């Protein structure tokens, strides 16, 4: 029987109550017939499949494993063709009062300062990495950043090294390979920048073709 404006008020409430009880009864029947599903933190809609043995990278292998879908960190051996790239590559960290920005650089030249344990290193990197440097003492041509920007407080070089080599210098250090960081004695300066050193990549790729050299002591 449809509910209309002509239906008496008391009958409307009886019909609506009947519909509500019917829906509640149907829900109870379906709930009682449904299979029990264990509840966990991930989902209550289905039984979770058994976890497979997690694949863990093994740095000792020093090679790409297709099952892992990524390259693990390892140190190339002396006769590895990638060893020269490893020897010259470093992580770069620019630290301002609030944030730390990271990049990668490689040593392309150096200059003897005629001072014990000091030399000037010329580190190549991408311009968008070097752009994080805010050194008020930078060379005049490159010292044109907004002075409202947070200045760089420290510059750090890092390298993934063999734990046994570290232990020769620091006896209490761990044997495991680890990332070692060393802060330079002074903030670097910008020695060179360009975005035109590659001209045949096509217009859509030129924004990524940037290059810079940092002078660090």
Swiss-Prot record:
Q: Does the keyword Signal apply?
A: yes
* Keyword set includes Signal: yes
Lipid attachment residues per UniProt (N-palmitoyl cysteine): 33
Provide the membrane topology annotation. Lipid-anchor
Attached lipid, kind S-diacylglycerol cysteine, located at: 33
Residues of the signal peptide: 1-32
Q: Where in the cell is it found?
A: Cell membrane
Pfam families given in the database record? Mycop_pep_DUF31
Q: Which GO terms describe its cellular component?
A: plasma membrane
Q: Which UniProt keywords apply?
A: Cell membrane, Lipoprotein, Membrane, Palmitate, Signal
Stated family: Belongs to the MG067/MG068/MG395 family.
Q: What is this protein called?
A: Uncharacterized lipoprotein MPN_590
What is the organism field in this record? Mycoplasma pneumoniae (strain ATCC 29342 / M129 / Subtype 1) (Mycoplasmoides pneumoniae)
């Amino acid at each position: 029987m449809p509910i209309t404006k002509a239906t008496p008020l008391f009958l409307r409430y009886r019909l609506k109550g009947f519909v509500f009880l019917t829906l509640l009864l149907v829900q109870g029947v379906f709930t009682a017939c449904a299979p029990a599903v264990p509840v966990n933190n991930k989902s209550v809609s289905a039984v979770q499949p058994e976890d497979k043995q997690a694949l863990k990278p093994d740095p000792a292998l020093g090679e790409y494993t297709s099952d892992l879908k990524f390259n693990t960190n390892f140190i190339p051996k002396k006769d590895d063709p990638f060893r020269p790239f490893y020897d010259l590559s470093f992580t770069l960290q620019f630290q301002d009062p609030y944030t730390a920005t990271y990049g990668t650089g490689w040593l392309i030249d150096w200059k003897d300062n005629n001072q014990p344990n000091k030399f000037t290193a010329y580190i190549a990197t991408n311009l968008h990495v070097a752009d994080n440097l805010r050194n008020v003492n930078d060379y005049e041509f490159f010292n044109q950043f907004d002075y409202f920007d947070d200045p760089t407080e420290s510059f750090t070089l890092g390298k993934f090294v063999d734990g046994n080599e570290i232990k020769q210098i620091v006896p209490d250090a761990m044997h495991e390979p680890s990332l070692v960081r060393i802060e330079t004695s002074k903030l670097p300066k910008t020695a060179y920048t360009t975005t035109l050193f590659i001209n045949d990549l096509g217009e859509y790729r030129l924004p990524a073709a940037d290059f810079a050299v940092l002078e660090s002591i």
